[in-house]
């Protein structure tokens, strides 16, 4: 998914009395309040098994790039339906359904390729994006990106990413796209 930067997201999602810096901080706070949810999803045994199975395929970089090009150029590309209707995708939706701010979940393998997605994304390969690099390559426990317009969910959103691990070894990453909303609050509030 490609994000279009939004300079004045505060003007769109928050009251005019809130300064942009304060709004950005509030959005990031809302995302950080969902780190536990993201970690629970990433630790789910079905989710981890799906990532491990995808990694075992040892997909070549050329195959990933070819799939990424076909994914982006063809809305009818069969892999789109396969990755949104798989048991893994159904599990992603089930695990995130209770939080109305989660508009998308993306599960990625050790190369940044989609394992499964809760809804169609704008691209297949996330390996060139911070949502994969920060938790997988850099090993950040949680990464919250800047609020932006998300083309695949057609909403102003912030992305929260965490690693998927097998013991102490990172095997993939999970991103939750959270819609930015004036009344966004921590789960359970």
Predicted regions: what they are:
Residues 5-15:
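Bacterial N-terminal signal peptides
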Residues 20-77, 101:
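Juxtamembrane extracytoplasmic/periplasmic/luminal helical "stalk" adjacent to the first N-terminal
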Residues 25, 29-32, 79-103, 178-189:
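Solvent-exposed, extracytoplasmic
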Residues 77-92, 120-148:
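Extracytoplasmic/periplasmic sensor domains and loops in membrane signaling proteins
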Residues 102-104, 159-160:
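Short loop/turn microsegments at loop-to-beta-strand junctions
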Residues 104-110:
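Short hydrophobic alpha-helical segments used for membrane anchoring or interfacial signaling
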Residues 114-118:
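Amphipathic coiled-coil signal-relay and dimerization helices
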Residues 155-188:
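Conserved beta-strands of PAS-like sensory domains
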